[in-house]
Amino acid sequence: MDRNILRSAREDPHRTATDIQMIISSPNEPVPSKRTVRRRLQQAGLHGRKPVKKPFISKKNRMARVAWAKAHLRWGRQEWAKHIWSDESKFNLFGSDGNSWVRRPVGSRYSPKYQCPTVKHGGGSVMVWGCFTSTSMGPLRRIQSIMDRFQYENIFETTMRPWALQNVGRGFVFQQDNDPKHTSLHVRSWFQRRHVHLLDWPSQSPDLNPIEHLWEELERRLGGIRASNADAKFNQLENAWKAIPMSVIHKLIDSMPRRCQAVIDANGYATKY
């Protein structure tokens, strides 16, 4: 019976104790209780845990991810020197979207000391666009209206390109994901007119973009500091952005071989990055 319980759980990790109980039931053997099933699984080290949420990746995109990872597996700082990494991110004015915990004595649930203040409608947020290279931090641009193809082009024309020419030089390679506004004809025409080279990028691959961890670094540096309004929040973000040392950037670029290897090992599925 124990062997059947473990086999059933390993065949499909999403099966519940009730599912396994029904699957292994046999007319010639007693039906194990759900408690027995759980105990056997725990003894074998198979504990029930909330699964990590990762985006679904199609077979076509998995193959493209593996191919890209293999092609760039051995690239280091020198190979990435002319590449500009970019992305957009949202930051809340009044804390994060995640769950928070508090340690409090029994009976003190409603004490102000142990409360987590909230603001109606979430308190607002600030959208930003940023970029960086292996040799320098790029600008952080505030997005104050709907981020469409026209504003995206404006960011390139007035912010990204002037900075890139001054800090990276001509012949830079720009990285972006495959969001529809990024790949629109309007934006593609701008790249062609300005002779900007694009890095071929596999869809559904945030784990290959090191800037994702730069957003986490920015959030960590703010340390939950609150802002009274959107202007104050952006000032906080910009100051923290400028204070990020190059040692952090170097670590992110140096992580690229590991990111690529992780994608290869996972056969294109989402990785821990």
From Swiss-Prot:
Q: Which GO terms describe its cellular component?
A: nucleus
Q: Which GO terms describe its molecular function?
A: DNA binding; endonuclease activity
Localization: Nucleus
Name the Gene Ontology biological process terms.
DNA integration; DNA transposition
Q: What is its main location?
A: nucleus
What does the UniProt keyword field contain?
A: DNA integration, DNA recombination, DNA-binding, Endonuclease, Hydrolase, Nuclease, Nucleus, Transposable element
Q: Which family does it belong to?
A: Belongs to the transposase 5 family.
UniProt function note: Probably essential for transposable element Tc1 transposition. The insertion of Tc1 is the main cause of spontaneous mutations. It is an endonuclease which can produce a single strand nick at the 5'-end of the transposon.
Further comment found in the protein's record:
The N-terminal region of Tc1 transposase has strong affinity for double and single-stranded DNA.
Q: What is this protein called?
A: Transposable element Tc1 transposase
Lineage per the UniProt record: Eukaryota, Metazoa, Ecdysozoa, Nematoda, Chromadorea
